[in-house]
Amino acid sequence: MQVSDFHFDLPDELIARYPQSERTASRLLQLNGNTGAVKDGSFKDVLELVQAGDLVVFNNTRVIPARMFGRKESGGKLEVLVERMLDEKRFLAHVRSSKSPKPGTLVFLGEEDQYSAEMVARQDALFELHLKADKTILEVLEEIGHMPLPPYIDRPDEDADKERYQTVYNQKPGAVAAPTAGLHFDNQLLEQIKAKGAEFAYVTLHVGAGTFQPVKVDNILEHHMHSEYAEVPQEVVDAIKATKARGGRVIAVGTTSVRSLESAAQESLKNGTELMPFFGDTEIFIFPGYQYQLVDCLITNFHLPESTLIMLVSAFAGYDHTMNAYQHAVANQYRFFSYGDAMFIEKKTQ
């Protein structure tokens, strides 16, 4: 398939630049992957859609305030977007400046040069930096960092984003983009779903800035997926096995939860074992033709045209059904991308 097969026209005004006043106030488009039928509703409908005995899988990563502003030794301005923390002092980052800093030079971070870091080496599009401070990189980010809003939101971050560009159940710092399907859940809705008899499980996938990188090839088979760190612990494996045994469904909240679970499934298949825990980097690229191993239903936001994520959804619900649902969403003025509306999709099994 060609990347252009996943194009759709999106009016600029449908890109959500701010969240709704309440997390659960977003709209929800239901899609049946077998029939292609769509149904308009509100996100609170999730409470009716999740059944007793189902397992809802969330990504508990925490978005770090990964964007820092500073300057080079020469005085030129720069912007640093942390991609991954290697340890408490060393990190990989995207660096934007008029001229790339050279290895061995210092950069000063913060509005008032509060901190400095040494440029250690360049790794493709990323730079390895070493923080010169008696604090950890996480502590420095919490002090001077900005929330790394996606480029299409096209505005500076605001104080409210520290709360709203973060799920209420986040636990493990490391993401530089939010697992956005989870942004729609508040604590009340979570409690109501649990009270129905559904179970919860938590995976971790630290979403990288690569999630916003455009696909730069024409043939999707030639695309090389960016790497992200994921964890599927033993208790999640046990919960999935128990759910399948009782006839319940595995409902993944977000494409990052899907990619975590399916990474564990693929690794186990490769090793010829039953489902095992997974800890490590994943480059899993899911597109039409992929056979899902674990996930039965998917809650997800609306994704960018020609992105790997709309390809993942197309593999889940069927290409035609997905593209038709997106046309319906555009025609009915759904809000798109990170702060936008959501879908509840039942997997295509026929």
Swiss-Prot record:
Signal peptide: none annotated. InterPro entries: QueA, QueA_dom1, QueA_dom2, QueA_sf. GO terms for biological process: queuosine biosynthetic process; tRNA wobble guanine modification. Its EC number is 2.4.99.17. One of its GO terms (molecular function) is S-adenosylmethionine:tRNA ribosyltransferase-isomerase activity. Keywords: Cytoplasm, Queuosine biosynthesis, S-adenosyl-L-methionine, Transferase. It catalyses: 7-aminomethyl-7-carbaguanosine(34) in tRNA + S-adenosyl-L-methionine = epoxyqueuosine(34) in tRNA + adenine + L-methionine + 2 H(+). It holds the Pfam family Queuosine_synth. Transfers and isomerizes the ribose moiety from AdoMet to the 7-aminomethyl group of 7-deazaguanine (preQ1-tRNA) to give epoxyqueuosine (oQ-tRNA). Belongs to the QueA family. Monomer. This is S-adenosylmethionine:tRNA ribosyltransferase-isomerase.
